């Protein structure tokens, strides 16, 4: 995880002729590290000014830990207000709301950063065989984790269904114009190295580049995660209504009673919920892991046995440097993979 701190800046713009401040605001970040020692929000302002016919100014700056994560969550939280890239269209009330959200996320990031770092460190430490007793606080956090995880899963399922609908529509010339405004099909093709064939043909060379690696491994398992059946209406009635109404919306679109643009708006709301659930899950998970420490788990909350595992893997980078012609011989173009890209903003 990237723990780099930095600044979240709000850049506004002013019309040079009328002197009127527009409702467009760029919400971006500046990382605070050795590579960016001479960069600041003021420097970014000057860079953004190039090519912009309106005068730019810094509306506000929020300093924060986890600056990349905070910026990502902020844009997801307010996806329906985004227009393109990092730009948002905000009235005075909405601007204040986004700024307050940035400050709140920064405050929470400051509190959680130490636990997130500690949790990453603990993942690299072998555990004992001992389970420790739970506490009411940890049991409550486990519920938060389970609820957040369930929401993320449901969001993912609905978002995938939306992408399938858009993908089908983009294959229909009568619907491309409507759907192409907020969704596109992207094709990718990656080269594939046939490791097994190379190993069979050049076993001696292959053996020279097989590297043993000792790592601590152990997947955390949260109590109740496999059989979680809690109804959404019991902990988030608003989200329950969205889930319950989704099938009806899809049916109406299939019957031509609703435009597919509605689904794009729905997908933006899913991004907001995803951001909230991701943040809640991260906070609960890191706190539980830190409480678990080097123990094998917490009774009724988490099982997290970790032990050293030795694995062997091919050092492909070193092999390619030493035998580029052989690697090229066993490398071929992979299948073309199509992905549906849904606009994360409402720029129309």
Positions of the model-derived regions?
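Eukaryotic low-complexity, Ser/Thr/Pro- and acidic-rich intrinsically disordered regulatory regions
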Residues: 140, 215, 283-284, 347
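Non-catalytic accessory segments flanking enzymatic or RNA/DNA-binding domains
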Residues: 1-171, 176-179, 192-208, 212-220, ...
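Acidic, glycine-rich two-metal-ion catalytic cores of nucleic acid-processing enzymes
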Residues: 197-215, 219, 223, 310-348
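Conserved catalytic/binding loops enriched for acidic/polar residues
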Residues: 183-185, 306
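Heptad-repeat amphipathic alpha-helical coiled-coil interaction surface used
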Residues: 145, 152, 159, 267-270, ...
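Fold-core signature of tandem repeat domains
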Residues: 162, 166, 263, 267-270
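Intrinsically disordered, low-complexity segments enriched in Gly and acidic/Ser/Thr residues
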Residues: 279-305
């Amino acid at each position: 995880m990237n723990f780099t701190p930095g600044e979240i800046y709000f850049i506004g713009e002013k019309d040079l002729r009328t002197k009127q401040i527009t409702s467009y605001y760029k919400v971006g970040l500046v990382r605070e590290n050795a590579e960016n020692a001479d960069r600041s929000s003021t420097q970014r302002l000057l860079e953004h000014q190039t090519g912009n016919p309106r005068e730019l100014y810094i509306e506000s700056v929020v300093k924060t830990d986890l600056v990349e994560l905070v910026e990502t969550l902020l844009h997801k939280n307010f996806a329906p207000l985004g227009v393109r890239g990092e730009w948002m269209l905000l009235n005075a009330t909405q601007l204040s709301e986004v700024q307050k959200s940035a400050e709140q996320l920064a405050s929470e990031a400051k509190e959680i950063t130490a636990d997130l770092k500690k949790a990453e460190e603990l993942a690299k430490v072998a555990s004992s065989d001992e389970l420790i007793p739970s506490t009411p606080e940890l049991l409550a956090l486990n519920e938060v984790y389970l609820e957040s995880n369930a929401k993320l899963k449901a969001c993912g399922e609905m978002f995938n269904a939306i992408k399938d609908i858009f993908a089908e529509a983009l294959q229909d010339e009568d619907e491309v114009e409507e759907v192409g405004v907020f969704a596109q099909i992207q094709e990718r093709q990656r080269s594939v190295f046939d490791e097994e064939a190379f190993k069979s043909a050049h076993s001696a060379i292959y053996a020279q580049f097989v590297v043993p690696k000792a790592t601590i491994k152990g997947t955390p398992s949260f109590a109740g995660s496999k059989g979680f059946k809690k109804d959404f209406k019991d902990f988030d009635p608003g989200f329950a209504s969205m889930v319950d109404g989704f099938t009806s919306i899809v049916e109406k679109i299939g019957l031509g009673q609703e435009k597919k643009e509605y689904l794009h708006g729905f997908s933006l709301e899913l991004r907001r919920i995803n951001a909230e659930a991701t943040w809640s899950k991260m906070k609960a998970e890191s706190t539980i892991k830190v409480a678990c420490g080097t123990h094998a788990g917490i009774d009724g909350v988490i099982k997290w046995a970790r032990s050293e595992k030795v694995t062997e893997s091919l050092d492909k980078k070193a092999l390619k440097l030493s035998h580029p012609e052989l690697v090229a011989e066993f490398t071929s173009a992979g299948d073309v993979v199509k992905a549906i890209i849904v606009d994360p903003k409402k720029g129309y």
